[in-house]
Amino acid sequence: MPVERFLLDASVAVEWFLPGGGPGARYAESVLERVSAGELVPSVPDLWHYEIASVLIAAKRDKRISAKKLRSSQVSIRGLQLETLAIELNAADLVDLSQRYHLQGYDTVYFETARRLAIPIASIDGGIKTACRVFGVKLL
């Protein structure tokens, strides 16, 4: 089976690291299983690292995860073998694209990266999923 490259939205990865099993937990787990099996290769915009770190730090501070869970999440992230992508988007262009796609700025970075590279995106975010349908970007 060929390996498929895809863009990993933080909304999916957050489900891997935080307890509670939100509405996208089953989907997120299926993505992780395919990554672990070597079927999928995750790519992320550089923004992903900042978002995930921020979520994990806040979860630890708010006592939603323990120090042990924080450390195990760090080990898991290092083991993902992520391909980090950088696309050029200045703030003015990001505002224009966000308005065009009806997305928040952060979500636009994920969506625009997948669109430019013509790779599918794994996301739980409703706005990103809608933009994918409207603008022809493949959802994983």
PLM region descriptions:
Residues 64-65, 103, 137:
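Helix N-cap/coil-helix junction residues
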Residues 1-5, 34, 111-140:
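Acidic, PIN/NYN-like endoribonuclease modules and their adjacent C-terminal/linker elements
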Residues 15-17, 55, 131:
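Residues that scaffold the ATP/ADP-binding catalytic core of kinase and kinase-like folds
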Residues 1-47, 59-72:
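Short, well-structured N-terminal submotif of metal-dependent ribonuclease cores
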Residues 11-14, 29, 74, 95, ...:
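Residues within alpha-helical segments
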Residues 70, 74-76, 83:
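Extended, non-globular alpha-helical segments
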